[in-house]
Curated annotation (Swiss-Prot):
Gene Ontology CC entries for this record: cytoplasm
Family note: Belongs to the SdhE FAD assembly factor family.
UniProt keyword list: Chaperone, Cytoplasm
UniProt key word Glycoprotein: no
Gene3D superfamilies: Flavinator of succinate dehydrogenase (1.10.150.250)
Organism: Pseudomonas putida (strain ATCC 47054 / DSM 6125 / CFBP 8728 / NCIMB 11950 / KT2440)
Subcellular location: Cytoplasm
PANTHER family tied to this protein: FAD ASSEMBLY FACTOR SDHE
Pfam families reported in the protein's UniProt record: Sdh5 (PF03937)
Function recorded in the entry: An FAD assembly protein, which accelerates covalent attachment of the cofactor into other proteins. Plays an essential role in the assembly of succinate dehydrogenase (SDH, respiratory complex II), an enzyme complex that is a component of both the tricarboxylic acid cycle and the electron transport chain, and which couples the oxidation of succinate to fumarate with the reduction of ubiquinone (coenzyme Q) to ubiquinol. Required for flavinylation (covalent attachment of FAD) of the flavoprotein subunit SdhA of SDH and other flavinylated proteins as well.
Protein name: FAD assembly factor SdhE
């Protein structure tokens, strides 16, 4: 179970100041992060340490992360919002 303090901390780290990232990351943190396994939670935290411009390119699908694990997390987040 995820503690509320951890969720609060991640909520603020997910607010990037770039609207395109905020609309993806903030709801993901609130709605999906608590359901992730420990490995994916750690991966999400690692994703948050990346530069905004890098993440913007990944989420807009202009580029891909060189790290396949980070790219997998990007895909998890995008799959949540993209129509199937």
């Amino acid at each position: 179970m995820v503690e509320q303090t951890e969720l609060n901390r991640l909520f603020w780290h997910s607010r990037r100041g770039m609207l395109e990232l905020d609309v993806l990351l903030v709801p993901f943190t609130q709605e999906v992060y608590p359901t992730l396994n420990e490995t994916d939670r750690e991966l999400y935290v690692r994703l948050l340490s990346c530069e905004d411009q890098d993440m913007f390119g990944w989420f807009m699908e202009r580029t891909e992360s060189e790290d396949p694990e980070l790219q997998r997390m990007v895909r998890i987040i995008l799959d949540r919002v993209q129509p199937k």
